[in-house]
Amino acid sequence: QIAANANFKYKTAVENYEKINHLYEEIRTSPGALRVIPKPVAKYDELTEVKAKAAEETYEAGIQALLKNTREDAKQAYYYFNDANTFSPGYREAIEMIEQAKFNATLKVVVQPSLINYRDWNFEPIVFGYNANMFVKFYTPQQAEELKLEKVDQYIKVIVNGYQEGRPIITSKTESFSDSVKTGEKIVKGVKTPIHTKVSATLTTYTKKITGRGSINLIITDAGNRAEIKNQDIIADETWSDSWGTYKGDERALSDGAKRLCQKKEPYPERTYIENRTRKELDNRLSNELRSFYSRY
């Protein structure tokens, strides 16, 4: 039964007929179910007929939504046209209307280039790599001009404030070790007995830490009134640390871990290691900020 005035009545009918046909196939392939329901009913002909009407129904809904000329209505139109094309592939101009609705629904953001900055850091790949919301698209100024975009919604810019690396900070701690080690044997009443000697050592453990800090500024501006929508500093700190040791006394008193520590020399990170790690963390934080901000669109 299809209600005369129900919203999307044919779309609902498609869903119901598909459920009936699924149940029909389940029964048809189950001997036990066939004993209970020997003549299951299928609705394939009805489904074909109602799909055509559902395509028309959702296509017209898409047209009406698109005529309202808002981003949110264009989004809805996009889904309506997709439904129409699913019900009847290639229905009228459904494919073209899907593209038009998506274009109308898309927030168009022009990425403004940054000035020459520290080590030519470039965060544009992170911005252009954003894909968490299909209704947000970023353009270079050249692309916006070539495409003759009638309306730009926002401008976005990432400014590199700089990178600083602190002086190495070295801390130390000293601890004592002692042990009893076998140094020989003696015969006591005809029995070999080990001779133990107490040994001791002091271990000094040195830890070197170097911290790098990078900072960028994310600015998003409304293209219509040039008001700043977002102006945020994004900061990343990255710390490198390593340890080595020295000892005084008898090495035999040291644990295996302490011995390995004493075999190391004072460490130094690779020249750009901390900087590269800091840059990678800035990439991650910028990506997260974009994902969070544009999720509302």
Name what the model sees in each region:
Residues 96, 137-143, 198-203:
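N-terminal post-signal-peptidase region of extra-cytosolic proteins
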Residues 1-6, 116-132, 149:
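Start-of-domain marker
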